Regions:
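Nucleotide-state-sensitive switch-loop elements of NTP-binding domains
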Residues: 2-20, 24-139, 144
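C-terminal accessory "lid"/substrate-recognition subdomains
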Residues: 2-3, 148, 155, 164-244
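Short glycine-centered, acidic/aromatic-flanked micro-motifs in structured strand/loop junctions
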Residues: 16, 99, 159-160, 236
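Conserved beta-strand/loop subsegment of P-loop NTPase cores
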Residues: 39-40, 94-96, 120-132, 150-161, ...
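Short, conserved catalytic or adaptor-binding loops enriched in Gly and charged residues
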Residues: 55-56, 64, 149, 176-178
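A broadly conserved amphipathic alpha-helix scaffold signal in soluble, globular proteins
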Residues: 106, 110-113, 154, 174-177
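Short histidine/acidic/glycine/proline-rich micro-motifs that form metal-
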Residues: 136, 162-163
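Flexible active-site lid/hinge loop adjacent to a nucleotide/diphosphate
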Residues: 137-152, 158
Length: 244
């Protein structure tokens, strides 16, 4: 079958603020016995791929992009990597893009509409946002990215439910609904949601996104990095004493 006759490859964008549990969810997707194979693109803020080190040794291909958000300087790399993956599309059933916790997901999603080759070969299946139920109020207060991650979500995994009371959980859901009244919310502890709840959902709704961001398809975005967030990375050849 020719490339033009093939069905588009479904893409899941996995996002969530730092520490919310998105890498734990990715590990679940990669290791459960569901019979599917995924190509995984992991973006990490900083030069060292910390998240890639946390991903378990699964029989998947991991493409890691460092030193810049997918939504900014790495967008070109994302298009290049996706184009390269299409040459090996018979080796996987879907693509998962795990963004850095500092990313606004809107420009990531734009990638699948502004590049003609990527648009033909792929289909954005869902934006899945993992939310830390315990710390969400603080994140909403100090991070515009955390709000955008919720606003653009098709599916929200409300994680770390074991750390909050029912009253606190209800208040968190109320805060989420004020930002995004449409997304499906799945409560979880340690990101323990069924894989079928986040993969193969055909949940991305372009019309809803255009209502929020009329210029979404223009390929232009006002996203800026948080200037207060920086990363410093270094490698050592011996254990570090955290008390010194």
């Amino acid at each position: 079958m020719s490339d033009t006759a093939r069905a588009p490859v479904p893409v899941t964008v996995l996002t969530g603020y730092l520490g919310a549990g998105k890498t734990t969810l990715l590990n679940r997707i990669l290791t459960e016995n569901h019979g599917q194979k995924f190509a995984v693109v992991i973006n990490e803020f900083g030069e060292l791929g910390v998240d890639n080190d946390l991903v378990v040794d699964a029989d998947e291909e991991v493409f890691e992009m460092n030193n810049g958000c997918i939504c900014c300087t790495v967008r070109g790399d994302l298009i290049r990597i996706l184009s390269g993956l299409m040459k090996r599309r018979d080796k996987f059933d879907g693509i998962i893009v795990e963004t850095t916790g500092l990313a606004d997901p809107a420009p990531v999603a734009q990638t699948f509409f502004v590049d003609d080759d990527v648009k033909r070969a792929t289909k954005l299946d869902a934006i899945v946002t993992v939310v830390d139920a315990k710390h969400l109020p603080a994140r909403l207060a100090d991070s515009a990215e955390a709000q955008e991650q919720i606003a653009f979500a098709d599916i929200i995994v409300l994680n770390k439910m074991d750390l909050v009371s029912e009253a606190e959980a209800a208040e968190v859901e109320k805060r989420i609904r004020a930002i995004n009244p449409y997304a499906e919310i799945r409560r979880a502890t340690k990101s323990d949601v069924p894989i079928s709840a986040v993969i193969g959902r055909d949940a991305f709704n372009l019309e809803r996104i255009l209502e929020r961001e009329p210029e979404f398809l223009s390929g232009e975005d006002d996203h800026e990095h948080d200037s207060e967030v920086n990363s410093v990375s270094f490698e050592v050849d011996r254990p570090i004493d955290a008390e010194r």
